[in-house]
């Protein structure tokens, strides 16, 4: 239970961090060729008759992306940083030291070129999924070829607020991350995650009103 967790865990550190992120705008061009079929069955006397129609299908399109985030800190676990999305970028503000008290402000150690590989993978996966979504209505689809090419990619640098909690429970170390804007929590613990989230939020939410999303470029 969460009560047992609270009683038996030992908090090693809880810290608000402005994590460096690269926010990418981009466009992907997609082309695909497919073999598709529609099979229909009906009964004729004692027999089940199946009719299959075959189609050559082509798809061409563009996908536009706005502010796809990738954290630029090797010290932050990528899985945690990806999982606490989304952030509401309408709240982005110009840099001001007024937002920094009580938070660490980390600097990127992975530049936009290094992080581009990760964001392109995300964009390609999303574009491929959107392409496949247009292939509904068929009973079977075989991919013959797909080409997904980036046409533009523009990075922007921002600092986004994250709460990090390091704790030890039953001789194991656990790491939690919480979106400092929305309160979304990610972390692995073999107890009720909802109750742990409420407990963690009780510590940090009173300070969330002091945070902001900071746009640097």
Regions found by a protein language model. Name each.
Residues 188-201:
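Juxtamembrane/start-of-transmembrane alpha-helix segments at the extracytoplasmic/lumenal side
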Residues 2-168:
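Charged, low-complexity helical/coil segments in non-catalytic cytosolic or luminal regions
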Residues 160-189:
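Extended, hydrophilic extramembrane loops/domains of integral membrane proteins
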Residues 31-33, 172-173, 184, 194-195:
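Flexible loop/turn segments at secondary-structure boundaries
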Residues 209-217:
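Juxtamembrane boundary at the C-terminal end of a transmembrane helix
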């Amino acid at each position: 239970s969460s009560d047992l967790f609270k009683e038996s865990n030992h908090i090693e550190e809880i810290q608000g961090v402005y994590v460096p992120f690269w926010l990418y705008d981009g466009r992907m061009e997609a082309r695909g060729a497919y073999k598709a079929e529609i099979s229909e069955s009906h009964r004729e006397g004692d027999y089940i008759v199946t009719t299959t129609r075959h189609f050559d299908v082509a798809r061409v399109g563009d996908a536009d992306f706005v502010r796809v985030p990738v954290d630029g800190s090797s010290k932050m676990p990528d899985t945690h940083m990806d999982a606490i999305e989304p952030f509401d970028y309408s709240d982005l503000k110009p840099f001001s030291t007024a937002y920094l008290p009580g938070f660490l402000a980390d600097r990127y150690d992975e530049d936009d070129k290094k992080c581009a590989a990760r964001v392109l993978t995300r964009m390609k996966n999303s574009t491929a999924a959107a392409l496949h979504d247009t292939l509904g209505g068929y009973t079977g689809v075989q991919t013959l070829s797909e080409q997904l090419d980036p046409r533009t990619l523009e990075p922007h640098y921002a600092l986004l607020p994250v709460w990090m909690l390091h704790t030890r429970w039953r001789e194991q170390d656990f790491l939690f991350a919480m979106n400092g804007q929305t309160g979304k929590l990610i972390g692995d613990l073999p107890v009720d995650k909802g109750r742990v989230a409420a407990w963690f939020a009780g510590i940090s939410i009173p300070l969330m009103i002091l945070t902001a999303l900071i746009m640097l470029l």
